[in-house]
A protein has these predicted regions:
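Short acidic alpha-helix initiation/capping motifs at coil-to-helix transition points
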Residues: 1, 11-15, 404
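Basic/polar N-terminal segments that are highly enriched at the extreme N-terminus
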Residues: 1-5, 436
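C-terminal catalytic subdomain
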Residues: 302-311, 317-363
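Catalytic or ion-coupling anion/metal-binding cores of large enzyme and transporter domains
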Residues: 173-197, 231, 235-237, 337-436
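Alpha/beta enzyme core
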Residues: 6-300, 306, 312-325
Length: 436
């Protein structure tokens, strides 16, 4: 029996893994199509060998658009019970991935709970954990310290890790020279940048990339190449710093693939609507079709409290134009750690964006549920409409709180007997149409 190290290694050897079979069924594709796409790096199936309860998903522009939910504790909000409520909400609402971005206390028990109990893909950002794991100042951490935390997360079963490998000491010169309005807004990227400035040392994730690849190959961890220089405002979109880093991420993608390590590439950020599609095309060219994982992008800077909407607008265009993976954004973005309701609103907005893009791209069977909704609405079958809804609970609650009168209970309180659907059904059936 032929053995393999990673999903990519298996695919290149002609082996169809159980994970590939699952993805093929979900995506209405042949297993050979999925195997070939994984072999080429155009589809990633993040699936750590230790995440035994995982229900695997494929991430690629030609597949259904997937969404990720960020959560985790901070120094100011450190109740893991609340974070587990967010986890359950994410799983129940159909999110395909969860990233634990915890930045306070002992993070390992929560991370292990996720990989032992949660069926969706789990991701982390090891650089966050480095400072709190060792309880030492950033400047005192060695390159080996950072590498060991990557190994710890891999051993704990996380399916993908965001690593800010693309910024180097050259980036310090670029940031100072080009004077961005928002500098670096990536939390992980800013930590790497700060350490380089304080110590004079190179980015450990870049300098020791081959050692990190060995870890990822051993445990089959997908690398999500973090974009430290993603634009944090419209003024910085598609600038020299962003593109220079993207070119380096393309080079690192080749190196990872040479080790049979799967790759996703992270992208912006804050981007004007007219630049979103172009950003997707640039990434596809530079990174050779590796799955693109975008934060939003947010298409305006002026909507704190509503950034789940600005991100959904950008996310729909991005996914339609080639992005494979959307990181959700909540109403609390730029303001606070999201609460349970914020998380739900963020998931709904991102799921709408992903679904709308899948319809536009012609993803197999993406529109089936919309057609079922149309059928249910035509016959005023409310239970069937709720069954088709992205969020049935909310839809039913709104209707139940404002029911129409009994003599037109098949309609809603917006139109009552003026309901166009009711009138057309009666007219086409040859029935008398009572309005008053």
């Amino acid at each position: 029996m032929q053995t393999y190290t990673t999903q990519m290694d298996a695919a290149r050897k002609g082996i169809v893994t159980p994970q590939m079979e699952t993805v093929a069924k979900k995506e209405y594709r042949t297993v050979e199509e999925i195997r070939q796409l994984v072999a080429e790096g155009k589809v990633a199936i993040p699936a750590n060998k230790h995440h035994e309860c995982l229900n695997p998903e494929g991430i690629g522009s030609m597949l259904r658009t997937k969404i990720n939910v960020n959560l985790g504790v901070s120094r100011d909000c450190k109740d893991y019970n609340i974070e587990m409520q967010k986890v359950m909400s994410a799983v129940n609402m159909g999110a395909e991935a969860i990233m634990d971005l915890s930045s306070h206390g002992n993070t390992q028990p929560f991370r292990q709970k996720l990989t032992h109990e949660c069926p969706v893909m789990i991701g982390t950002v090891p650089v966050y954990d480095s400072v709190i794991h060792y309880q030492r100042d950033l400047a005192t951490l060695t390159a080996q310290d950072f590498i060991d935390v990557v190994r710890l997360h891999a051993e704990d079963g996380v399916d993908f890790v965001t690593l800010h490998c693309g910024i180097t000491r050259k980036t310090i010169e670029q940031i100072r020279k080009h004077k961005r309005k928002m500098n670096i807004v990536s939390r992980g990227g800013s930590l790497v940048f700060a350490r380089m400035c304080m110590t004079g040392n190179e980015n450990p994730f870049y300098e020791h990339f081959d050692e990190i690849l060995d870890i990822c190959e051993e445990h089959d961890v997908t690398i999500s190449l973090g974009d430290a220089c993603r634009p944090g405002c419209l003024a910085d979109a598609t600038d020299v710093c962003q593109i220079e880093e993207l070119v380096r991420l393309g080079e690192l993608t080749k190196r990872a693939w040479a080790h049979n390590v799967q790759v996703m590439v992270e992208g912006p950020g804050h981007v004007p609507l007219n630049q979103v599609a172009a950003n997707m095309e640039i990434q596809k060219t530079i990174c050779m079709g590796a799955p693109f994982y975008v934060l939003g992008p947010l298409v305006t800077d002026i909507a704190p409290g509503y950034d789940h909407i600005t991100a959904a607008i950008g996310g729909a265009v991005a996914a339609m134009s080639g992005a494979a993976f959307l990181c959700y954004v909540t109403p609390a973005e730029h303001l606070a750690l999201p609460n349970v309701d914020d998380v739900k609103q963020g998931i709904v907005a991102s799921k709408i964006a992903a679904h709308a893009a899948d319809i536009a791209k012609g993803i197999p069977h993406a529109r089936d549920i919309d057609d079922k909704m149309g059928d249910a609405r035509r016959v005023l079958d409310w239970d069937a409409q709720f069954a088709c809804a992205l969020d049935p609970e909310t839809a039913k609650a709104i209707r139940d709180a404002r029911l129409p009168e009994d003599d037109h209970s098949d309609t809603c309180s917006m139109c009552g007997k003026f309901c166009a659907v009711r009138s057309m059904n009666k007219a086409l059936a040859g029935e008398y149409i009572d309005i008053l």
